[in-house]
Amino acid sequence: MSTDVTNSATNKISARIRMIAQVGMLAAIATVLMLFEIPLPFAPAFYEIDFSEVPILVGCFTMGPLAGAAIEFIKILLNFAINGTMTAGVGEIANFLIGCALVVPAGLIYKKMHSRKGAIIGMITGTVVMTFLGCFLNAYILLPTYAKAFEMPMDLSLIHI
């Protein structure tokens, strides 16, 4: 009886350690991928494409949406420690919120529909949520905060949603 309890406790600890190690490794991979950002043509300099969401999606699909959000957060912290910030933290907050808007819905749907179809539906849903949330956050919160932080004028009459 006591060996069953001991084995159960050991298995729980091993699973927790394995999850922490996986989160750390995926966050490190995402951070390295984030270093290779591609600027978008015809867009402001702070809009860039990076492939750092791929390992986060892998982690989200294998360990759940909470782990995906944790990987996203650690990636942002590591990138902040390596590169610092040129956006007074607004870009890092934007990256975290918009990244979570992609991976959390994808992870939640995949958790309910554990199949290739569920992964595809999750990624499509995550992309749609990320697009709408990104537009809203950029228009009403992030860009005004960025403009205020750098004392730049911003004409809010240009925003029509």
Model-derived regions: residue spans:
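Loop-helix junctions at membrane interfaces
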Residues: 1-159
